[in-house]
UniProtKB/Swiss-Prot annotation:
The gene is glgX. GO terms for molecular function: glycogen debranching enzyme activity; hydrolase activity, hydrolyzing O-glycosyl compounds. Pathway: Glycan degradation; glycogen degradation. This is Glycogen debranching enzyme. Pfam families: Alpha-amylase, CBM_48, GlgX_C. It catalyses: Hydrolysis of (1->6)-alpha-D-glucosidic linkages to branches with degrees of polymerization of three or four glucose residues in limit dextrin. The active site is at D338 (nucleophile), E373 (proton donor). It comes from Cronobacter sakazakii (strain ATCC BAA-894) (Enterobacter sakazakii).
Amino acid sequence: MMQLNAGHSAPPGAWFDGAGVNFTLFSAHAEKVELCLFDESGNETRYALPARSGDVWHGYLPGARPGLRYGYRVHGPWNPAQGHRFNPAKLLLDPCARGVEGDVIDDPRLYGGIDTPDPRDNRDAMPKSVVMDDRYDWEDDAPPNIAWGETVIYEAHVRGLTRLHPDIPPALRGTYAALGHPAMIAWFQRLGITALELQPVAKFCSEPRLQRLGLANYWGYNPLALWAIETRYASQPAPQAALNEFRDAVKALHKAGIEVILDVVLNHSAELDLEGPTFSLRGIDNRSYYWIQDDGDYHNWTGCGNTLNLSHPAVVDYAIGCLKFWVEQCHVDGFRFDLATVMGRTPEFRQDAPLFEAMRRDRSLSAVKLIVEPWDIGPGGYQVGNYPPPFAEWNDRFRDDMRRFWLRSELDVGEVATRVAASADVYRRNGREPWACVNLVTAHDGFTLRDCVSFNGKHNEANGEDNRDGAWENHSNNHGYEGLGGGQSVQDARRASTHALLASLLLSQGTPMLLAGDEQGHSQHGNNNAYCQDNELTWFDWSQADEGLVAYTAALIRLRRQIPALTASRWWEENDGNVRWLNAAGAPMRPEEWHSGTRQLQILLSDRWLVTLNGRDEVSEIVLPEGEWRAVPPFAGEDNPVVMAVWHGPAHGVCVFRKS
């Protein structure tokens, strides 16, 4: 039997140094930690970690190699009222494991107990941590380092984007390899996007409730092991092969000049509430990892049963180590943080929260793009506009106001102008720049763009909750017919609204984020919460792509790059050459016009580009300002000879002109 020596208290997790493996595990309240190793037949051998430095338990196993499967059993007090739920009958995943073998199938042995510890051994039902080999040939890979002002984000799901792509070999569809395939690279370049933002690719599992309904967690916001690659998206599902396949995709995307941003769920874990399974953190040090109420229950500020305590020094270290792994070992270019108010809780939200300060101090993390979803469901959870530099934020005000203007006729141009100007009322503070405003009209969470113009209500019956889940208010408009059908007049109106929303997104100051599939006309048939639909409802049907809409979207992105006012990282000032606001007569907007109910606006950008908006329900005449103006693609041909002085704007229409 091999013997462990003391080893070292860092780095976190299991690290192969060429001669053996160093194991570390944080637990402030444990009394004993056993390292459990598994051979090819599943036989378990246990070793007590021989050393403790502060609250880190550690040991070194000479001769151990990558591919070794392991877990932990952690001994300590069972005192639920104090937040302690140690149960050595439960094999636990290493929170810092960079590989996990096996998937979670709901099994009663996975539950640690509520009032008393469950004595059943979960070994045969529990996925295993895997020692990984971090050596990888990155060749001459370098980050594209796209300036924020030039950034156009494309939010996508690994499987949904590529599962039905006809030009990708069947064995690679729905995988990391597909992302780096020449067919996908060509698609990204055709659109002109600069950053691929991927929904979670860290190891996750399906909630027990979904499994019992015969459904699966598709989106991935139920994290099991945040440092480990999700193997279900790999063409070769062994953890090491999956990790290297992901790295291959990143390398290929970088060669094409495309950044990779990962959606990360640093707010809760798959252990859910007190009735949920015990996989890792609950059994390792429940009181340290989670926000615990006075009675020992969890603060549920995420809506998922538990909330990570990211003000605890050890949990901050855990989060920082996780992010650094993805940047330094996988070369990702940034992160989008789900329910990110949790990251700043102390428990009150603070701009100088420990995790934020640690991220700003870290050389690797301060050099990548950091984007937050600036809310959670806890007290004071809505924090839009309140994040410190260098964070950018999803701007739900842009999403809602643009939908309300174009689809519901509920706003006038004053509010629209504010959103076009990078929502300066929200973000122009604390030294932040316009790129901190991430504009979106749709995201994975909610209606697709096509569904926004095709459905008044959500249709989530397939989710198994009798349509109770998902947002009730979507600021959508079916244009007179509920569903994808309808006559030609309905389709024409929908097309106009779609074009207007895309133009608003891509021709506004700030960082635009396009939901993958919106450029194709992808529909989820009214499901605005398709988190559990891993099927044709969410997979893109490339054979049905709306080529006209694809061309329109790509042309808007090309147009955006030509307009300095949209790509410069400085706030607009009246008459500074960046922007002038004009009325339908081509004259400067008067103060009383902004909120007078008018729904027409002209925006002169960089003294040469004129964006005209007609939010009325009928064709309206808009007089262009003095000069020779020609409409530009996608609103006219490349060599448009027609000089216009008046634009007869169609209902809910947009056009862009260039001054000769």
